[in-house]
């Protein structure tokens, strides 16, 4: 018993990032050497992601409602500058992907469209309609189905009602609930090394590395665009806001948010991680409690890259020449589509036919491109989520630090 306690204390003294790195390395080894054991270890990953997904909707609802209920008149949440950054970042990602698609034209071997079972949206109107319907969804269903647009809407309304009509005791109870849920999130995050070990070992055991070799160039363009956004464009946007070296903040967000998101492959599951990081960075709670859940829904630079690169690849494969005006229009469509990706089953991949329609590509061919997306999804989806989620907290921090700098001046 004493040995067990001393072992846990020894593990506790090692930083969480190092524990995650150890879990990652061990997962690669187990998944490669013993696929059967790797698949069995996947249970740890499923439990970890399941716990994060379960607690995230409750956390967002309670935290946003508590923040609005406790909000003092005269204090501002400063959400507008962050939304502007989200839109600039998403459009920059789409434009970068268009340029990369022109400079590095990619031809792909189309997979069978039968691999895709869900129906894509018929147009941009359907995407926007889906978002608006999510806004007025039943609040219980919104929490149960992790509909963050609906959760945010009802939390804002309930919080405003409590602020104007609730007693001090009621508002304090809601605040205590928010603190309790945040504590539960901290407990779950402590299991991240074990969860990531399970996720990595099962992924390696299921897919190996050979399945991705046939799409190496397509993956190189996708990942190259995402790396360029994460390491060049986003730092430039952050520098524009804070007027100092952005890379310490960028690398902190990539390390403490992006790594989690890469392995969980879920922006929703990463919301508690981003909330904890925002608190650690000393950001304004009234701001990040709203902007981070909102970012998980509308800040989709990674999705814009996926939609654009695969649409451009489809055009090149069909022998279609893409002029600059059409490419610019594709960037705009990809930006709007990406912002609605969370409201579409299948996310960014099932918005590819919408982008392909700009080039007159048939739906049958477009769905074959979607099938290719699912084949490379083990890497594409992980990198996309890591970029999307780490950018949520990065832009929130940039806007908040800019506000603090302006106030100091």
Curated annotation (Swiss-Prot):
Keyword Cell inner membrane: yes
Keyword line: Amino-acid transport, Cell inner membrane, Cell membrane, Membrane, Symport, Transmembrane, Transmembrane helix, Transport
Domain of life of the source: Bacteria
Pfam families (alphabetical): SDF
Predominant location category: membrane
Gene Ontology MF: a single term: neutral L-amino acid:sodium symporter activity
Catalytic activity, reaction form: L-serine(in) + Na(+)(in) = L-serine(out) + Na(+)(out); L-threonine(in) + Na(+)(in) = L-threonine(out) + Na(+)(out)
Single biological process term from Gene Ontology: threonine transport
Topology in the lipid bilayer: Multi-pass membrane protein
Record's GO cellular component terms: plasma membrane
Localization (cell): Cell inner membrane
Annotated TM spans: 24-44, 48-68, 82-102, 142-162, 194-214, 218-238, 292-312, 319-339, 365-385
Function in brief: Involved in the import of serine and threonine into the cell, with the concomitant import of sodium (symport system).
Family statement: Belongs to the dicarboxylate/amino acid:cation symporter (DAACS) (TC 2.A.23) family.
HAMAP family according to UniProt: Ser_Thr_transp_SstT (MF_01582)
Protein name: Serine/threonine transporter SstT
